[in-house]
Amino acid sequence: METLELQGAKLRYHQVGQGPVLIFIPGANGTGDIFLPLAEQLKDHFTVVAVDRRDYGESELAEPLPDSASNPDSDYRVKRDAQDIAELAKSLSDEPVYILGSSSGSIVAMHVLKDYPEVVKKIAFHEPPINTFLPDSTYWKDKNDDIVHQILTEGLEKGMKTFGETLNIAPIDAKMMSQPADTEEGRIEQYKRTMFWSKFEIRQYTHSDITLDDFTKYSDKITLLNGTDSRGSFPQDVNFYINKETGIPIVDIPGGHLGYIQKPEGFADVLLNMWG
């Protein structure tokens, strides 16, 4: 893996291929390896970069998180993630880059576009579970508060079951999300990673400060992506709302919420039609 030294962290990332830079931002998994099957499909067209977000995988922290980062309204980590991606983009290219964020990674991508538009050539938001600008935002914020409370008091299994039911996660995705790692060490790491995400992201990222105006001023750069196998899920409804209010196009892409793993060839074909 490659390394970028940043304030308070060493950011690790996979890099394959040649051509214009395309950065993938992972969601709850936090690590870029989930994008490697997709990267193989794109490496003849792009320099594909798949990041281990700060606090995840091989990326190393040189300073502890502030205590306030677990506050439900804290934007510390999502803003730090966005700054990391912007600094990575600048280190890799003198030109604006392509960026795709998936799930909570797409919320990070939104903050990159909002705060560092100069690094973005084109950007895609794949099934973002953000609720800030929705008419029923308070309802969804309360639901996420309840989910995190259940995880912390009744256990991860019950809380994640409620999470899947509340967001109407498709069966193809629920099966993959609940699949345990192959080794005991892997299962322990998987548990720690999911608990960290529960404490520091479910509430904070989904209710972070993004508005529809943040999209309209850069609408020519944005594509919304919805999976063909995850119809009816909450993240898809978010994209439909953005589309209705701003006119930014939605493109159907193969697979579900984890389509880049489930159907990497078809996923890549859509990206190449968009950006190739």
From Swiss-Prot:
GO MF terms held by the record: hydrolase activity
Pfam families: Abhydrolase_1
Keywords, ordered alphabetically: Hydrolase
Enzyme class: hydrolase
Highest taxon in the source lineage: Bacteria
Chain ranges of the AB hydrolase-1 domain: 20-137
Keyword Transport recorded: no
Cellular compartments per GO CC: membrane
EC number(s) recorded for this UniProt protein: 3.-.-.-
InterPro entries linked: AB_hydrolase_1, AB_hydrolase_fold, AB_hydrolase_sf
Protein family membership: Belongs to the AB hydrolase superfamily.
Protein name (Swiss-Prot/TrEMBL): Uncharacterized hydrolase SAR2661
